[in-house]
Amino acid sequence: MSVQIKKFAILGERCSGTNFLEESILSNFNLTHTIEYGSKHFFCFNKYDKANTGDTLFIGIIRNPIYWLNSFSKELYHIPEINRSPLKNFLFNEFYSVDDELDVSNNNNTVFFMNSHPYTYKYKTNTKDLNYVTGKKYKNIFEMRKLKNKYLINIMPTQVKNFILINYEDLLYNYDQTLSDLKLKFNLIQTTKKFEIVTKYKKSETYKFVRQRLISFPENLIKLLWANLDVNQEAQLGYFMGNNNAHFKTKYIVNKDVPNTDSCNESTSQIM
């Protein structure tokens, strides 16, 4: 007798659509979100007892590499100071993540707004986001993407009973069909008459969800990025050389004219 799925956990890199996915599932299905199995971003060292995961749906999510790098380079979550700037460091330095520890010399929080007394940060290497093969730092962000994608493709399905890997673009452009597929495949209980579309970020009433940032990388940089990506793996995931989602080979009919809804003022025309 199959066990009814009651919980879900998400696995995906930063800036890969994990928050959008979480809100979409919570808004439409009778499931609770769990973090009992570990971090959604730093998942390669998580521990799973396959025999006891029957009531949990594990969803991996990946994103077009150019859009992902474009966003991640501007939203530098858990990135050490040395890799934050210039862009060349972010792309080609040894890649590792840090735990952000706020060091406040004055307990009066108003000092944050005084330029003469800003908050300072102390960084500690996050050992759960090291190379899971060697236990060392990744050569660069491209090796990190390749190995963590490999984990989601090949290893994660062997660790738990209910796992599926989806593309952020499918969820974004084929929302109803993607949620319907999840519902049918895993016998999920839908709580809405029709699927509700997420518009607000993490239940915020003011912070609207941004579907895609406008690509700010110049064409020569995009070509350089593809030269460092594992093109065979990317093709397996549905991504091909190009700088827009028209190159995403979704299994559904998509609207290729969906506009970007956010632009970034950062200049990334050079990587030096």
What feature does the model see in each segment?
Residues 82-189, 221-222, 229-233:
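PAPS-dependent sulfotransferase catalytic domain
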Residues 64-67, 171:
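Conserved nucleotide-binding/hydrolysis micro-motifs of P-loop NTPases
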Residues 57-61, 164-166:
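Hydrophobic/aromatic beta-strand patches that form the interior of the parallel beta-sheet core
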Residues 24, 68, 178-182:
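Alpha-helical scaffold elements adjacent to nucleotide-binding pockets in ATP/GTP-utilizing enzyme cores
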Residues 1-56, 71-85, 90, 204, ...:
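PAPS-dependent sulfotransferase catalytic core
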Residues 1-7, 131, 136-139, 150-159, ...:
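PAPS-dependent sulfotransferases, especially Golgi type II membrane carbohydrate sulfotransferases
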Residues 69-71, 174:
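Active-site-adjacent loop/helix micro-motif of nuclease/hydrolase catalytic cores
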Residues 13, 63-64:
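Glycine-rich His-Gly loop
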